[in-house]
Amino acid sequence: VDGSLGSHSAAFKEPYSDKPEDSGILTANIDSLKTWISKADNYNLQITVHAIGDKANNTLLNTYENVIRSNGDKDRRFRVEHAQHLDQNDISRFSDLNVIASMQPYHAIDDGRWAEDLIGPERINTTYAFKSLIDANTTLVFGSDWPVAPASPIFGMYAAVTRQTLDSKNPGGWVPEQKISLEQALYAYTKDAAYSSFDENIKGTLEVGKLADFVILSDDLTMIESEDIKEVTVLATYIGGEKVYENN
């Protein structure tokens, strides 16, 4: 629906703090977007759309809501990719509409170094709003945005749990109110991620009858300090119960 924060092309309701003449851009014609989404939904295709700025997210949620009302109830699992900057009033709408927030926690500790310069101290409070979304009963799932960001889910969990920016200037976490627990981050990368792609019956948890895809880590993530998560390494990887990687 829009661009990115760093390029000032993410679409916001209010202008950028450092560029008061600019509020970003919507990259899609909204009427066309609704038509495309509605047609795809009628073919039972799952819809996932990029939205970063608060205007873009609001516009996409409005479009999703219109399509849901027009096409009737069913198990859609519409997704918003990024859901990065949200209007406070839109946070509860994800759960109300059964829309999944698909987010990339690494970006929080990267953008956190400079985001406030671009959008000011108020709007950052609902930037990468992991905890607010979970508290509103949203299905939150995590990914990497690779190759734009590192692919490692371990580093992503570190980012979600600590929110310590890459410049080490926020030891208590950038917007610490939005930090989540390790268990919540694990669910976002596993169980809920599988649900978000209609794969919960075959993966996401280790259960009889599901794919035996798993890793063995150097440390128990639940037994170490959150600051040490980023140092954890993969000792072995299994796909379908067969070892496909071993760290020698």
PLM-predicted stretches and their roles:
Residues 38-47, 55-78, 82-83, 88-92, ...:
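His/Asp/Glu-enriched, well-ordered alpha-helical/loop segment
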Residues 1-54, 58, 62, 93-100, ...:
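Metal-coordinating catalytic core of metallo-dependent amide/deamination hydrolases
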Residues 247-248:
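Extracellular/periplasmic ectodomains of large secreted or surface enzymes and adhesion receptors
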